[in-house]
């Protein structure tokens, strides 16, 4: 909260996660669905390991092809050729199928060719939209025990 006051900046909190807020403050602004935060930059509440999990879409990123900034909602794999999903990374718990489908559907209307994950993760540099859909389908096949191991 101190930094938001120092820079006169809002703290944007998805309404779905407001119950986790332990220090209410005038700087906190809740939102739901989508929220334009800058020209060409939209927050998309897509769910995931928290109901309010969100990603940012930057329409002009990747030379105008679009970028998703996903944090820990969508993980780019080390080989930079797939993405994956987790409910709890520290506990190695998978994200349920319904939540995976919700994430993919939420970003569906947006154009993007690149995905930047959180932390020091690799970057999916091209074809991200197609890779996301294919990776989600493969992930669900593994959840169901239907995937061929390659």
What are these regions (language model features)?
Residues 2-147:
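Metallo-beta-lactamase
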């Amino acid at each position: 909260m101190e930094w938001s006051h120092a820079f006169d900046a809002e703290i944007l909190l998805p309404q779905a996660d407001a119950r986790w807020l332990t220090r209410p403050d005038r700087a906190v602004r809740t939102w739901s669905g989508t929220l334009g935060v800058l020209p060409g930059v939209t927050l998309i509440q897509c769910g995931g390991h928290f109901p309010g999990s969100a990603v940012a879409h930057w329409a002009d990123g990747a030379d105008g092809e679009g970028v998703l900034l996903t944090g820990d909602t969508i993980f780019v794999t080390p080989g930079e050729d797939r993405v994956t999903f987790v409910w709890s990374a520290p506990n190695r718990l998978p994200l349920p199928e319904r939540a995976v489908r919700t994430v993919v559907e939420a970003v569906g209307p947006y154009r993007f060719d690149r995905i930047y994950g959180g932390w020091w993760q690799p970057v999916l540099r091209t074809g991200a939209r197609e890779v996301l859909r294919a990776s989600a389908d493969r992930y669900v096949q593994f959840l169901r025990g239907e995937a061929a191991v390659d």
